[in-house]
Amino acid sequence: PYYLESVVTDLKKSGLLRTYYRDKLRGYRLGVRAKNRLLDNWPERFAPYLTGDTDTNRLKSEIGRRLRLHRLAETYVTMDNAGVGLFQDEKPKVFAPQGYSDGAVKYPSFYSSREVKEMGVDTTQIRSSRFTGVLLTSGGIYVTYNSSAALMKWRYKSEMRVKALMWSVLCQQRLTGQYNADAVQGVILGESMELAY
């Protein structure tokens, strides 16, 4: 913890990271200098997240939306620690709006709910789902949720629509040779197993 605190302190002193407080909830945001440095050095990796009218550029002040971003960040860190591909330049563009036909997924890759929704009109039916993204491996499709420290508030119909969409798009259209109907499963991340009972 001490090392992490010193890194965050250094980033704040350098003007690369800003602390944001609201409703007794602390968060960190990239400063303009940090965004510019990322875009200058790795445009293919960070441009999809830091340019245009993206969710990451809009300030989230409502506590519910900020907590969702925290859960998504926890999910990203978990996937990164597991060696799963996160960035668009290191994984197949399975959910591209124009379709996908580049072959099987060979390495585990995580696609955020926002990346999935980039497919277009078909994804309007999953707007109210609680999923944070989809983990694709060579052998399965895992719709991923993160309850963090709270009990998950399930919307059964919404979650079944996500499963149906993954089955339709991946098993029947884009990756038909790789996945069958039983391939769509789920992964729930959380702070402890106590919330699962």
Model-derived segments and their meaning:
Residues 124-132, 146-196:
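Catalytic cores of nucleic-acid endonucleases
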Residues 19, 29, 87-90, 187-189:
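A structural signal for short, well-ordered beta-strand segments and their strand-loop junctions
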Residues 53-150:
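Exposed, interaction-prone assembly regions rather than primary DNA-binding/catalytic cores
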